[in-house]
């Protein structure tokens, strides 16, 4: 049995203003009012209304951060609790710490830009923006709630809007992509429900699903391993982890630009956040044994997805596999037992959210002009679309982790954190870093070759016949500019973001390290421990954890 102190999960700071509840209820309430908004049929009033609601939501989250959040504290802040169904221990409990506050800000920020990106939508605009606002509230709830059953409900709430946005406004294979998405995500979420019920009713004490209560429960190692495995499958689908990733290229291949931004910018981050919140924070004994598997899966993500992206001729699918590759670094950071590596994973999620949203928006803008996604049918449009080419170039350089961009800082932190993590043997660290570096090398190869095929060379006859090969319009420049400001800002001054979650990450890693050190017979053979580790994999003079 693993015993540890509840670090960073006690003594929550109460909210003086219910900012988090407002950030959830405003977009959901705004969505419910859309049927009553007068409109002349073109959706103009609906678009402006939805944009105002998303901007208000963004301002609420900013106000929450500026007035009620202290980055130096590791525990919960902006805490609200209202009894809901006390018979089964269910309460409306919301709060924020370093794991959730940055992602809440990211969600409201990207959703407001996605709403602006949806300006050309004229087919059923009332339903489209209703779903977009409902998705905004559901995604913020995923990061803000502090009750595992509420988390499950919020997790399910955002699935239906995504399904309908794909099925109604997607491409030719939209029904297939939407059905595959709902089967993967809804099916895997069953593991979340089972784990929530098991953790809420077992482990001693009064039945409760609040994170603070679950962290204080006394779960056996076997119980933790079982729950961890189920949650890893559920969150691995959303991250996604290879081989649970196949829904993502299909979804991105059929989605519209604003839905792209929400998928890449926010949806994938829900999986990474949930791994940190539940698998690492609430199940530390199991995490100590599963961590090497996360590292290996991260490397598989990086290399497999990078190679697959290199071979893609469809622009959307190429960027989709690039996203999967970049999320592999998040797995390596989560699997490390270092503050630097885990902080890098958190920063990588934020960085990829911004960069992924920008790239997919540009994919949609380019398709609106060329009416093709096949690289073989593109080429030579750089002379006619110079501003668009400049935007593409800057965003691609950010994706390949150019120094001065946020991606460079996050990947460097992950590499440095894992390379210096003495919880793993030196040969294992060398092999993993070497393999992950292959993905770093492949990224500029497929991204720069993609730019060459789109913008350079001789213009195809089919494209030359198009009269709408116009350059980027002010709305598009504004959206990319808004995304590039934090990308470059974080790249030049990382503390702009890392200070917001460093205290919570330190508490989380301390908790996991304590659990690892108390393992007397670790089943993970590549972690330093007793007995089962082969001598060739042991680093010399690293000592042996003190048995309990």
Curated annotation (Swiss-Prot):
Residues passing through the membrane, by range: 17-37, 48-68, 103-123, 127-147, 149-169, 181-201, 222-242, 256-276, 290-310, 327-347, 348-368, 389-409, 430-450, 477-497
Membrane protein topology class: Multi-pass membrane protein
One GO cellular component term: plasma membrane-derived thylakoid membrane
GO molecular function: NADH dehydrogenase (ubiquinone) activity; ubiquinone binding
Catalysed reaction equations from the record: a plastoquinone + NADH + (n+1) H(+)(in) = a plastoquinol + NAD(+) + n H(+)(out); a plastoquinone + NADPH + (n+1) H(+)(in) = a plastoquinol + NADP(+) + n H(+)(out)
Cellular localization per UniProt: Cellular thylakoid membrane
Coiled coil: none
Keyword NADP belongs to the record: yes
EC number per UniProt: 7.1.1.-
InterPro entries named among the record's database cross-references: NADH_Q_OxRdtase_chain4, NADH_Q_OxRdtase_chainM/4, NADH_UbQ_OxRdtase, ND/Mrp_TM
Single biological process term from Gene Ontology: electron transport coupled proton transport
Predominant location: membrane
Taxonomic superkingdom: Bacteria
Pfam families linked to this entry: Proton_antipo_M
UniProt entry keywords in alphabetical sequence: Membrane, NAD, NADP, Plastoquinone, Quinone, Thylakoid, Translocase, Transmembrane, Transmembrane helix
NCBIfam families, alphabetized: NDH_I_M, PRK02546.1, PRK12561.1
PANTHER family named among the record's database cross-references: NAD(P)H-QUINONE OXIDOREDUCTASE CHAIN 4, CHLOROPLASTIC, NADH-UBIQUINONE OXIDOREDUCTASE CHAIN 4
Family: Belongs to the complex I subunit 4 family.
Record's function text: NDH-1 shuttles electrons from NAD(P)H, via FMN and iron-sulfur (Fe-S) centers, to quinones in the respiratory chain. The immediate electron acceptor for the enzyme in this species is believed to be plastoquinone. Couples the redox reaction to proton translocation (for every two electrons transferred, four hydrogen ions are translocated across the cytoplasmic membrane), and thus conserves the redox energy in a proton gradient.
Protein's name according to its UniProt entry: NAD(P)H-quinone oxidoreductase chain 4
Gene: ndhD
């Amino acid at each position: 049995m693993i015993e540890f102190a509840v670090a960073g999960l006690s003594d929550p700071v109460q909210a003086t203003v219910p900012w988090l509840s407002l950030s959830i209820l405003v977009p959901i309430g705004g969505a419910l009012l859309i049927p009553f908004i007068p409109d002349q049929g073109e959706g103009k009033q609906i678009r402006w209304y939805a944009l105002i609601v998303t901007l208000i939501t963004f301002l609420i989250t900013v106000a929450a951060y500026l007035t009620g959040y202290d980055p130096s504290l590791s525990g919960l802040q902006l805490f609200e609790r209202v009894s809901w169904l006390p018979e089964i221990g269910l309460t409306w409990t919301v709060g924020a710490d370093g794991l959730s506050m940055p992602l809440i800000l990211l969600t409201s920020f990207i959703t407001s830009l996605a709403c602006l990106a949806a300006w050309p939508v004229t087919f059923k605009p009332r339903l489209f923006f209703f779903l977009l606002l409902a998705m905004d509230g559901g995604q913020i709830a995923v990061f803000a709630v502090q009750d595992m059953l509420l988390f499950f409900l919020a997790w399910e709430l955002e699935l239906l809007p995504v399904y309908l946005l794909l099925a109604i406004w997607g491409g030719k294979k939209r029904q297939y992509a939407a059905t595959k998405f709902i089967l993967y995500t809804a099916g895997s979420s069953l593991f979340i429900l089972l784990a929530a019920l098991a953790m809420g009713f077992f482990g001693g004490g009064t039945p409760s699903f609040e994170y603070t209560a679950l962290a204080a429960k006394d779960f056996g190692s076997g119980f933790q391993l079982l729950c961890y495995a189920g949650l890893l499958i559920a969150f691995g689908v959303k991250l996604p982890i290879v081989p649970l990733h196949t829904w993502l290229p299909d979804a991105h291949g059929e989605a519209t630009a604003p839905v792209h931004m929400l998928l890449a910018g926010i949806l994938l981050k829900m999986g990474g956040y949930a791994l940190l919140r539940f698998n690492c924070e609430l199940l530390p004994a199991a995490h100590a044994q599963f961590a090497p598997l996360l590292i290996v899966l991260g490397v598989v993500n990086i290399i497999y997805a990078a190679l697959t992206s290199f071979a893609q001729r469809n622009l959307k699918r190429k960027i989709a596999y690039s996203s999967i590759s970049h999320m592999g670094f998040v797995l390596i950071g989560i699997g490390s037992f270092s503050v630097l590596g885990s902080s890098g994973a958190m920063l990588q999620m934020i960085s990829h959210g911004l960069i992924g949203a920008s790239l997919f928006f540009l994919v949609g803008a380019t398709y609106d002009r060329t009416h093709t996604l096949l690289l073989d049918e593109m080429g030579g449009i750089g002379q006619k679309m110079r501003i668009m080419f400049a935007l593409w170039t800057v965003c691609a350089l950010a994706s390949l982790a150019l120094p001065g961009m946020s991606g460079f800082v996050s990947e460097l932190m992950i590499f440095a954190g894992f390379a210096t993590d003495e919880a793993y043997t030196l040969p294992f660290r060398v092999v993993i870093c070497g393999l992950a570096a292959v993905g770093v090398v492949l990224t500029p190869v497929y991204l720069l070759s993609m730019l060459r095929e789109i913008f350079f060379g001789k213009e195809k006859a089919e494209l030359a016949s198009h009269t709408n090969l116009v350059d980027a319009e002010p709305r598009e420049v504004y959206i990319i500019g808004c995304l590039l400001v934090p990308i470059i800002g974080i790249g030049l001054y990382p503390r702009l973001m890392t200070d917001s979650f460093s205290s919570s990450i330190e508490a989380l890693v301390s908790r996991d390290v304590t659990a690892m050190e108390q393992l007397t017979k670790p089943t993970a053979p590549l972690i330093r421990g007793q007995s089962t580790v082969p001598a060739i994999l042991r680093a010399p003079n690293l000592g042996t954890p003190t048995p309990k």
